[in-house]
Amino acid sequence: MIWHVQNENFILDSTSIFMKAFHLLLFNGSFIFPECILIFGLILLLMFDSTSVQKDRPWFYFISSTCLVISITALLFRWREEPIISFSGNFQTNNFNEIFQFLILLCSTLCIPLSVEYIECTEMAITEFLLFVLTATLGGMFLCGANDLITIFVAPECFSLCSYLLSGYTERDLRSNGASLQYLLMGGAGSSILVHGFSWLYGSSGGEIELQEIVNGLINTQMYNSPGISLALISITVGLGFKLSPAPFHQWTPDVYEGSLLHFVAFHSITSKVAASASATRILEFSLYFSSNEWHLLLEILAILSMILGNLLAITQTSMKRMLAYSSIGQIGYVIIGIIVGDSNDGYASMITYMLFYISMNLGTFACIVLFGLRTGTDNIRDYAGLYTKDPFLALSLALCLLSLGGLPPLAGFFGKLYLFWCGWQAGLYFLVSIGLLTSVLSIYYYLKIIKLLMTGRNQEITPYVRNYRRSPLRSNNSIELSMTVCVIASTIPGISMNPILAIAQDTLF
């Protein structure tokens, strides 16, 4: 009899929870319409995989890319709408969040074509790869719009779990297995420290989890200057540091880059930084409003270490993957300048502008490396010597992307850095901007060193990889070259037409 009553209570409770969830989705589903499109795409991929045959594999790419493009379109139609908080305060929709979601979707859309040929050649499971990419994209999008501590913790875990699996996707490769394990351990440590900081915020604010309510709770409890807030600040900064991978939290980055598939590295190197930057901006700006001087100091230290160590260590690398890993550490140092400047001097607008250019520069570089790696099987920088003599288009594309990463005019990277540094200078961050300028000059050195190798015509310097270089006849090359061409153009042209881009970025401010 007791068991029967308990069973009835369980059914009633489950039904009540389901009805509440259905009610929330029914009345708030339109606010997450771009995310719902990706969820529909995931379901469609699973259904199609269970009924399709091997020859239908191109449809998987089509479904994934179409869902991403439709999701981008839905975001664009929602642009400039009034900010809305939905799902009982758990999710916020505004221009600032949507621009970061757009950057993540754009990166995912451009990354999928990079994986086509490699997966076809190795006969790896295509459905699982695309499912992980779409799920990681979904997690990143929810993180950008998260408005409470629980969602801010769960959403990046959705992203991270897929990233752990993607980093170890080539299960027979020992380096890939090692990269996946190292990434899992470091990511788990970062998440644990992050949630520890959240617990201090939750307790100090009187049990509040929404970002704005945490500020009100700290005022009501008079705990905004307590030691607990200092512990929360340190824990959250360290936890976010593992996600953004600035120095000194960068140790896992080169090893994971080197051991993982190139197209995953291209995807992860940007989406993780975009999502974590959006999350860091909201947490630090709102929940830790009363400790702004302290977190400014912490971020300044991280930015200086990242710009110096990232660019210095990149000079010594012989692997293209590891060089780009250390380069990305330096790049996140520049992005942190925009976070520190904040809303007052167009800091967020400069950060968004630079991230948009960084997507094209970085993805263009990775597209070139993917093509070269597929045709030669090597990742060594020395083996790029003389590539211009065999494939001028690929060599010039790689050179343009590297020069844009270095920040040489009139390419997009120059104008992105110029705007970022100018905003930092206007905000009084003279020392930080000076370090950024010096390290940018330093980065040009190792980028030019690679370009010099590309353009050399001396036979004694050309390795057998380039001497025996052949273009692949596979039709899927077109998709990689298309992504590469789009990224090269985007790394070059926007420098000439900055005003519309700046206007869009400034529209996103709070």
From Swiss-Prot:
EC number(s) from the headed UniProt entry: 7.1.1.-
GO cellular component terms listed in the entry, alphabetical order: chloroplast thylakoid membrane
GO biological process: ATP synthesis coupled electron transport; photosynthesis, light reaction
Membrane topology: Multi-pass membrane protein
One Gene Ontology molecular-function label: quinone binding
Annotated catalysed reactions: a plastoquinone + NADH + (n+1) H(+)(in) = a plastoquinol + NAD(+) + n H(+)(out); a plastoquinone + NADPH + (n+1) H(+)(in) = a plastoquinol + NADP(+) + n H(+)(out)
Coiled coil: none
InterPro entries, sorted: NADH-Q_OxRdtase_suN/2, ND/Mrp_TM, Ndh2_N
Transmembrane segments: 24-44, 59-79, 99-119, 124-144, 149-169, 183-203, 229-249, 295-315, 323-343, 354-374, 395-415, 418-438
Role this protein plays: NDH shuttles electrons from NAD(P)H:plastoquinone, via FMN and iron-sulfur (Fe-S) centers, to quinones in the photosynthetic chain and possibly in a chloroplast respiratory chain. The immediate electron acceptor for the enzyme in this species is believed to be plastoquinone. Couples the redox reaction to proton translocation, and thus conserves the redox energy in a proton gradient.
Family named by the database record: Belongs to the complex I subunit 2 family.
Name this polypeptide is given: NAD(P)H-quinone oxidoreductase subunit 2 A, chloroplastic
Lineage: Eukaryota, Viridiplantae, Streptophyta, Embryophyta, Tracheophyta
Gene: ndhB1
